[in-house]
A protein has these predicted regions:
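A hydrophobic alpha-helical transmembrane-helix feature that marks the membrane cores
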Residues: 1-227
Length: 227
């Protein structure tokens, strides 16, 4: 199989052709995003059903990080498609033990459904806003990256500090950062900043994945399920 960048669409000089190219990338991205999210949901469900041990979930998360680099390396070839499904499937399975904990709580299934619904509402609302306004949100990039780095460092520190209030604050901050990244990544596709729909899918998938996890944490805390 040739490594020709068949999954990228270069922007043309003609504005009309450039718009058509961006629309094609966006359409392909949404199709692939829907399929990978469905596959993640399937592997997460299987993980919950077999009661996957937390240690195995940690191993899968590490494997997922490795596969993330593989996806980016192979995104310009046909190998990128099986790579992205491997990545999203592994990451979906890795949250099985976490979901099992939430599902075992009072109103656990309701909380998970609320988090899913909230994630969908945020994603579709922000995507629609970016698509309808055609605003360029590239200016958010530096701010969002800085905020994400600070949040990750604080999360690592809180593993040892174990401060509940900090954990809650970080989840709220990450929800806002992911919302901003949805605007940023969608805007990049619209304006031709991202022409590879596999890479575009990975970006939006990660935004949705993290948005769901931290929204679920917030819902559990505010409904008394996660003290």
């Amino acid at each position: 199989m040739s490594d020709k960048p068949v999954f990228s669409t270069a922007a043309a000089m003609d504005p009309a052709a450039s718009i058509a190219s961006s629309n094609k990338v966006l359409s392909n991205t949404y199709w692939l995003l829907g399929l990978t999210l469905a596959f993640s949901a399937l592997t997460a469900t299987i993980s919950v059903a077999i009661n996957m041990p937390p240690m195995m979930a940690l191993v899968l998360m590490i494997v997922g990080f490795v596969l993330l680099f593989v996806v980016h390396k192979m995104a310009d070839s046909a190998k990128g498609l099986p790579a992205i499904f491997a990545f999203t499937g592994v990451w979906g399975a890795s949250i099985g033990p976490m979901l099992s904990v939430y599902l075992a709580m009072d109103n656990g299934p309701t909380m998970v459904l609320q988090a899913l619904g909230g994630t969908a509402l945020v994603f579709f609302s922000l995507s629609a806003y970016a698509l309808n306004t055609k605003r360029d949100f590239s200016y958010l990039g530096g701010f969002l990256l800085t905020g994400l780095i600070v949040a990750v460092v604080a999360m690592i520190a809180n593993i040892f500090l174990a401060i509940p209030a900090l954990s809650l604050t970080l989840s709220a901050v990450i929800v806002m950062i992911m919302a901003g990244l949805i605007l940023f990544d969608t805007s990049r596709i619209i304006h031709g900043g991202e022409t590879n729909y596999i890479r575009a899918t990975v970006g939006l998938y990660l935004n949705i994945f993290n948005l769901f996890i931290h929204l679920l944490h917030l819902i559990a805390v505010f409904t008394g399920g996660d003290d």
